[in-house]
Curated annotation (Swiss-Prot):
An essential GTPase that binds both GDP and GTP, with rapid nucleotide exchange. Plays a role in 16S rRNA processing and 30S ribosomal subunit biogenesis and possibly also in cell cycle regulation and energy metabolism. The gene is era. Keywords: Cell membrane, Cytoplasm, GTP-binding, Membrane, Nucleotide-binding, Ribosome biogenesis, RNA-binding, rRNA-binding. PROSITE patterns: G_ERA, KH_TYPE_2. It comes from Streptococcus pneumoniae (strain Hungary19A-6). Residues 38-42 are annotated as: G2. Residues 150-152 are annotated as: G5. Belongs to the TRAFAC class TrmE-Era-EngA-EngB-Septin-like GTPase superfamily. Era GTPase family. Monomer. GO terms for cellular component: cytosol; plasma membrane. This is GTPase Era. Pfam families: KH_2, MMR_HSR1. It is found in: Cytoplasm; Cell membrane. Disulfide bonds: none annotated. CDD domains: Era, KH-II_Era.
Length: 299
């Protein structure tokens, strides 16, 4: 039997459902999700393998107009995938009109010389007439290889999109073992799960100012639990107070919710300790960005 493989980038503005789509395809959480824009900060591979194919999806940070060094990192990280992949999924939301952000991405896609599939997500939120109007608008902007409407949240048409990708794969190598689902180490996934809970539970001023560093992660032979120590980094003392909460209640809630997800991922009992530290203006300091896992070497 001929084996086929290829790399597929998922690009789009923030909050269009890229990570939700990847997690649905993979059947488990690879990329964290929230309703906050710019939740994804790093490129994350989701490695989808069957007996006849391997599709390596690359989930990317939402492309936006950056205001910090962290924002620059995120946007360059996303665009760098255009040099690495065989196909691009350009994802747009069905319930929002085409905007300047979409046009900016389209101009880069036109210059990239790689096949682009337009994925219109969130079709569960609109009337079919609105969907058709949205598709026509984007079709007039560039020549897409395919246009596929989906609902990543409900799973509508997702398998059809995977089939289309599979049909267009070239014969190739199996780049990763069949049981490997991502390129990131467990420590990275743990830090992202803690950050996800911070995004879910705290107010608007917190999300973009938070980074999570896993200081240690090892199994305790006596308790047969994985002991994890993680530090939540913020930029201001006021943010530290919000995350800790009254009597430590918020930090305890963050830790409890994160621990459940981490246990599901690892298949082990977990003892999670979390601290909060202030690192002023870390989003504009390249050394701090590198220390917290946002390294220019990624692109």
């Amino acid at each position: 039997m001929t084996f086929k493989s290829g790399f597929v980038a998922i690009l789009g503005r923030p909050n269009v459902g890229k990570s939700t789509f990847l997690n649905h395809v993979m059947g488990q959480k690879i990329a964290i999700m929230s309703d906050k824009a710019q939740t994804t900060r790093n490129k994350i591979m989701g490695i989808y393998t069957t007996d006849k194919e391997q599709i390596v999806f690359i989930d990317t940070p939402g492309i936006h107009k950056p205001k910090t060094a962290l924002g620059d990192f995120m946007v360059e990280s996303a665009y760098s995938t255009l040099r690495e992949v065989d196909t691009v999924l350009f994802m747009v939301p069905a319930d929002e009109a085409r905007g300047k952000g979409d046009d900016m991405i389209i101009e880069r896609l036109k210059a990239a010389k790689v096949p682009v599939i337009l994925v219109v997500n969130k079709i569960d939120k609109v009337h079919p007439d609105q969907l058709l109007s949205q598709i026509d608008d984007f079709r007039n902007q560039m020549d897409f290889k395919e246009i596929v409407p989906i609902s990543a949240l409900q799973g509508n048409n997702v398998s059809r999109l995977v089939d289309i990708l599979s049909e267009n794969l070239d014969e190739g190598f199996q780049y990763f073992p069949s049981d490997q689902i991502t390129d990131h180490p467990e420590r990275f996934l743990v830090s992202e799960m803690v950050r996800e809970k911070v995004l879910h539970l705290t107010r608007e001023e917190i999300p973009h100012s938070v980074a999570v560093v896993v200081d240690s992660m090892k199994r305790d032979e006596e308790t047969d639990k994985v002991h994890i120590r993680a530090t939540i980094m913020v930029e201001r003392d006021s943010q530290k107070g919000i995350i800790i909460g009254k009597g430590g209640a918020m930090l305890k809630k963050i830790g409890s919710m994160a621990r459940r997800d981490i246990e599901l991922m690892l298949g082990d009992k977990v003892f999670l300790e979390t601290w909060v530290k202030v690192k002023k203006n870390w989003r504009d300091k390249k050394l701090d960005l590198a220390d917290f896992g946002y390294n220019e070497k990624e692109y």
